């Protein structure tokens, strides 16, 4: 267990890594944690459709407290500036920041959590501590991002965040986490953990592409073929997570976008953002959640439990293309009655030419869908997006 995270008095469930060998991967994919995670990701995608990151959205007092926690962690970066050292990657000052973070987090969580939720402090602290990278290797990757997804999902399962927080948890809290993660990457020259280079979606992140494509699934002001255009990036980088990611990539990498980010470049061939979202979720399940080198480092506890789901339990889907998804397709985390309300943006998206999206697009499930696309790694320079049958002709890149 991470140093600085101490159990309070009383008997608490053990928090431990459960995936010890390849045989455990099948157990993981049938676990309650796996199903809750997919439900949370897809439910959030359904909830944030058509809502910009900069829109006025509801922020509860608890969510504001969580945002202030990140302000405190950011101050630690100022207090631990990078050292002058000969090696290009892995500034050793990151280890000082990580140690300070581990020492401060228990106090921050103690102050933040109400008394009836303090029993979850250890588990929440474990997930959050693991969200910022590895202090030994001074690297960061999608496994650390996954730990933060466990943290977010746990906040809802413990009812620390409520149904009304589903939109702001993604567009405010996750976005704030993303800002700090990028600051750490730049300040300490952190190496990407487990990146496949040009054939990976991104060196560091994955989920902001999923949720960012969901934001654009209705009333998008531009179609997918345009997201690499400089004018689009400049205008919309603050409004959509997907474009924020593209902007960050363009700042840290040089050369033609199709050469250093081939997977993302191939997405410009996909006709709708809803299909992009479906393909990205499938890719996330295959390339991140199904990889032993990633999941062997994941911790499980009471909130994100390794216990199996009932036989026949299916993964929840995201059904995009509707501003108000049907109740059966909304998020379900832990218990069937944890369902978020239909989001209402107080500031509607600007009038713009909308994508032509069918009302029933492919589900983001583990099963194949006639209207989804599949993204897969390739060793060739051909497109990495395989459209399903009947998806229609793909537009050519300009």
UniProtKB/Swiss-Prot annotation:
InterPro entries: Phstyr_phstse_ac, PTPA_C_lid, PTPA_sf. Disruption phenotype: RNAi-mediated knockdown in neurons leads to impairment of locomotion. Residues 343-398 are annotated as: Disordered. It is found in: Cytoplasm; Nucleus. It comes from the Eukaryota. One of its GO terms (molecular function) is ATP binding. Residues 363-388 have a biased composition (Low complexity). Keywords: ATP-binding, Cytoplasm, Isomerase, Magnesium, Metal-binding, Nucleotide-binding, Nucleus, Rotamase. One of its GO terms (biological process) is basal protein localization. GO terms for cellular component: cytoplasm; nucleus; protein phosphatase type 2A complex. Its EC number is 5.2.1.8. Residues 343-352 have a biased composition (Pro residues). Mg(2+) binds at residues 197, 203. The keyword ATP-binding applies. Transmembrane segments: none annotated. Belongs to the PTPA-type PPIase family. Associates with PP2A heterodimeric core enzyme PP2A(D), composed of a catalytic subunit (subunit C) and a constant regulatory subunit (PR65 or subunit A). Interacts with the catalytic subunit Pp4-19C of the serine/threonine-protein phosphatase 4 (PP4) complex; thereby mediating basal localization of the Miranda (Mira) complex; probably by facilitating the dephosphorylation of Mira. PPIases accelerate the folding of proteins. It catalyzes the cis-trans isomerization of proline imidic peptide bonds in oligopeptides. Acts as a regulatory subunit for serine/threonine-protein phosphatase 2A (PP2A). Modulates PP2A activity or substrate specificity, probably by inducing a conformational change in the catalytic subunit, a proposed direct target of the PPIase. Acts as mediator for the basal localization of the Miranda (Mira) complex during mitosis of larval neuroblast asymmetric division. This is Serine/threonine-protein phosphatase 2A activator. It comes from Drosophila melanogaster. The gene is Ptpa.
């Amino acid at each position: 267990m991470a140093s600085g995270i101490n159990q309070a008095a009383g008997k608490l469930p053990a928090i431990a890594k459960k995936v010890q060998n390849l045989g455990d991967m099948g157990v993981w994919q049938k676990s309650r944690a796996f199903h809750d995670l997919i439900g949370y990701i897809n439910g959030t995608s359904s909830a944030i459709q058509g809502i910009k990151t900069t829109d006025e959205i509801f922020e509860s007092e608890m969510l504001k407290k969580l945002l202030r926690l990140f302000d405190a962690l950011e101050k630690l970066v100022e207090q631990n500036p990078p050292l002058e050292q000969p090696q290009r990657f892995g500034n050793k000052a990151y280890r000082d920041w990580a140690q300070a973070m581990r020492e401060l987090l228990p106090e921050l969580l103690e102050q933040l959590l109400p008394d009836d939720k303090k029993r979850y402090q250890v588990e929440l602290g474990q997930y959050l501590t693991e969200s910022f990278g590895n202090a030994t290797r001074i690297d960061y990757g999608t496994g650390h991002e996954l730990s933060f997804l466990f943290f977010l999902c746990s906040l809802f399962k413990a009812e620390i965040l409520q149904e009304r927080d589903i939109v702001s948890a993604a567009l405010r809290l996750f976005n704030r986490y993303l800002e700090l993660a990028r600051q750490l990457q730049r300040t300490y020259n952190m190496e990407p953990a487990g990146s496949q280079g040009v054939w990976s979606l991104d060196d560091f992140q994955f989920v902001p592409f999923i949720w960012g494509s969901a934001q654009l699934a209705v009333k998008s002001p531009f179609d997918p073929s345009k997201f690499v255009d400089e004018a689009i990036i400049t205008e919309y980088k603050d409004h959509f997570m997907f474009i924020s990611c593209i902007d960050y990539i363009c700042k840290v990498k040089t050369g033609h976008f199709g050469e250093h980010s081939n997977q993302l470049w191939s997405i410009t061939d996909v006709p709708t953002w809803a299909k992009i979202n479906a393909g990205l979720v499938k890719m996330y399940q295959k390339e991140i959640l199904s990889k032993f080198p990633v999941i062997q480092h994941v911790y499980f506890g009471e909130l994100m439990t390794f216990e199996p789901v009932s036989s026949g339990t299916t993964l929840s889907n995201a059904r995009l293309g509707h501003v108000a998804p049907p109740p059966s397709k909304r998020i379900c985390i832990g218990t069937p009655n944890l369902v978020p309300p239909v989001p209402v943006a107080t500031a509607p998206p600007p009038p713009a030419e909308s994508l032509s999206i069918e009302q029933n697009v492919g589900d983001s499930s583990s099963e194949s869908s006639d209207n989804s696309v599949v993204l897969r790694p390739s060793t060739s320079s051909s497109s990495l997006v395989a459209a399903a049958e009947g998806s229609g002709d793909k537009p050519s890149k300009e």
